Regions:
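N-terminal binding-site loop/beta-alpha segment at the start of enzyme catalytic domains
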Residues: 1-83
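A short acidic, helix-capping loop that chelates divalent metal ions and anchors anionic groups
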Residues: 56-61, 93-98, 291-294
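Short beta-strand segments at enzyme active-site cores
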Residues: 49-53, 86-89, 120-125, 155-156, ...
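Beta/alpha (TIM)-barrel catalytic core signal, keyed to glycine-rich beta->alpha loops juxtaposed to Asp/Glu
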Residues: 3, 129, 133-316
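Short, acidic/polar
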Residues: 31-42, 100-115, 164-169
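Active-site groove signature of glycoside hydrolases
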Residues: 113-132
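Active-site mouth loops of central-metabolism enzymes
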Residues: 22-33, 91-103, 131-132
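Acidic (Asp/Glu)-rich catalytic clusters
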Residues: 43-44, 73-84, 113-117, 146, ...
Length: 316
């Protein structure tokens, strides 16, 4: 795969591709060699926005957390391309660095930088809100990291509309670094996890959405069908959508739109997400190089108003 120019969109001061590559599989279902191949193909296909977290993949027996960052760091070091990619990681869920106290944030960022083999992060998320900590404490700590040059932009994930608004107001009032992005759980079969109050706060405040679970644990690839068996670590979660009328309606609508464009179902699901207000880049992961074209295709696929309406109605 040769390098091709790809559309970029603004995320604060950053310029990112229309698909963010999820790093949760690196060091979990993809070993280092497989991960390197996926990362190489993603960049060759025009991608530049890599998402990970310090906790990936602590849930795997024998892992401690930090495995994904380590794989990505080794790849960055071997390829010498740090300035060509946008690296996003998260703080607050690593077994050794839980929560958002100032001390935790400042210790965790240095561990992430070491594993990623870099001296700065492009985007640093609070992975889960920590309501035991005042927004003033963690935002001041994050601002310190920006001022120190360790972090370029900050963002939030898994936060309520109220706390997001409170955080933005504090940053504005105090002149501190401000969240430029929000990473919500959002896809065609999980709309109420973002739409409504949370999306309204993001839109009012110019905060970009970078949705995770963009393909609903693989359900929106279309490979899970009634009566089918899929060998995947995420099968149980994806299969739950088959038991709902909405899940089946969405698959039918995706089949129709995909056929009209001669596109993969996953590409259509991502294109719907990319067309939603505030969304700049959905996140999707690939365990193999063969899974990437359907994901990268989102940058080239524009759905018609009628197709968007069909998918809206099927997923309502």
């Amino acid at each position: 795969m040769t390098a091709t120019p790809a559309p970029r969109t603004s995320l604060g001061s950053l310029s990112v591709s229309r698909l963010s590559l999820g790093g949760n599989v690196f060091g979990w279902t993809a070993d280092e060699a497989e991960s390197f191949a996926v990362l190489d193909a993603y960049v060759a296909g025009g991608g530049n926005f890599i998402d990970t977290a310090d906790v990936y993949s602590a849930w795997v027996p024998g892992n401690k957390g930090g495995e994904s960052e380590t794989v990505i760091g080794n790849w960055l070091s071997s390829r010498g391309n740090r300035s060509d990619v946008v690296i996003a990681t998260k703080v607050g869920a690593h077994p050794a660095y839980k929560g958002l106290s100032a001390a935790t944030i400042k210790a965790a960022v240095d561990e992430s930088l070491t594993r990623l083999r870099t001296d700065y992060l492009d985007l640093y998320y609070t992975h889960y809100d920590d309501e035991s900590v005042e927004v003033s404490e963690f935002l001041t700590a994050l601002d310190d990291l920006v001022r120190a040059g360790k972090v370029r932009e900050i963002a939030a994930s898994n936060i309520s509309a109220q706390r997001l608004e409170e955080s933005l107001a504090f940053s504005d009032r105090e002149g501190l670094a401000r969240y430029v992005a929000l990473q919500p759980h959002y896809n065609l079969v999980s709309r109420d996890t973002y739409e409504g109050e949370l999306a309204d706060v993001a839109a009012r405040n110019g905060v970009a959405a970078v949705p995770y679970y963009a393909l609903a644990s693989g359900f929106l690839t279309g490979k899970y069908r009634p009566g089918s068996t899929v060998d995947s670590a995420r099968t149980a979660k994806a299969a739950t959508y088959l038991d709902t009328d909405r899940g089946l309606r969405v698959l039918t609508a995706l089949d129709s739109v995909a056929a009209a464009h001669e596109a993969e179902i996953a590409t259509v699901a991502l294109a719907w997400l990319a067309a939603q207000p505030t969304v700049v880049a959905p996140i999707a992961s690939a365990r193999t190089v063969e899974q990437l074209p359907a994901l990268l295709g989102v940058a080239e696929l524009t759905l018609t108003d009628a197709e968007l309406k069909l998918l809206d109605e099927a997923s309502a």
